[in-house]
């Protein structure tokens, strides 16, 4: 129920925006909203990529640490 915007809700929002801002300002607001959404998507994509890179580095470091610990245990037992 919450989080989903259907066609009736979008039409209501557009009607309210048309009443508040008028027909001349509406295209400008649409362009501004579109560019803002594009920038937001780009920023979230970059952030997601950085998080994935850090996760990979952590996995690599963790696996190399485990291998070093195993090597140290083997050296101590011999």
From Swiss-Prot:
Keyword presence, Transport: yes
Q: How does it sit in the membrane?
A: Single-pass membrane protein
Question: Per UniProt, what is one GO molecular function of this protein?
Answer: protein transmembrane transporter activity
Q: Which InterPro entries match?
A: TatA/B/E, TatA/E
Q: What Gene Ontology terms describe where this protein resides (cellular component)?
A: TAT protein transport complex
Name the residues that span the membrane.
Answer: 1-21
User: Matching Pfam families, A to Z?
Assistant: TatA_B_E
Q: Where is the composition biased (Basic and acidic residues)?
A: 59-78
Where it mainly occurs, coarsely classed, is membrane
Question: What are the protein's UniProt keywords?
Answer: Cell membrane, Membrane, Protein transport, Translocation, Transmembrane, Transmembrane helix, Transport
Keyword check for Ribonucleoprotein, yes or no.
Answer: no
- List all disulphide bridges recorded for this chain: none
The record's note on quaternary structure and interaction partners says: Forms a complex with TatC.
Q: Which family does it belong to?
A: Belongs to the TatA/E family.
Q: Which NCBIfam families match?
A: PRK14857.1 (NF011429), PRK14861.1 (NF011430), tatAE (TIGR01411)
- Entry function: Part of the twin-arginine translocation (Tat) system that transports large folded proteins containing a characteristic twin-arginine motif in their signal peptide across membranes. TatA could form the protein-conducting channel of the Tat system.
Name of the featured protein: Sec-independent protein translocase protein TatA
State the encoding gene.
tatA
């Amino acid at each position: 129920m919450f989080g989903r915007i259907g066609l009736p809700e979008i039409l209501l929002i557009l009607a309210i925006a048309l009443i508040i801002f008028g027909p001349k300002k509406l295209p400008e607001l649409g362009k501004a909203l579109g560019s803002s959404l594009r920038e937001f998507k780009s920023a979230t994509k970059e952030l997601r990529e950085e998080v994935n890179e850090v996760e990979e580095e952590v996995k690599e470091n963790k696996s190399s640490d485990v291998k070093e610990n195993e090597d140290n245990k083997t050296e101590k037992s011999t």
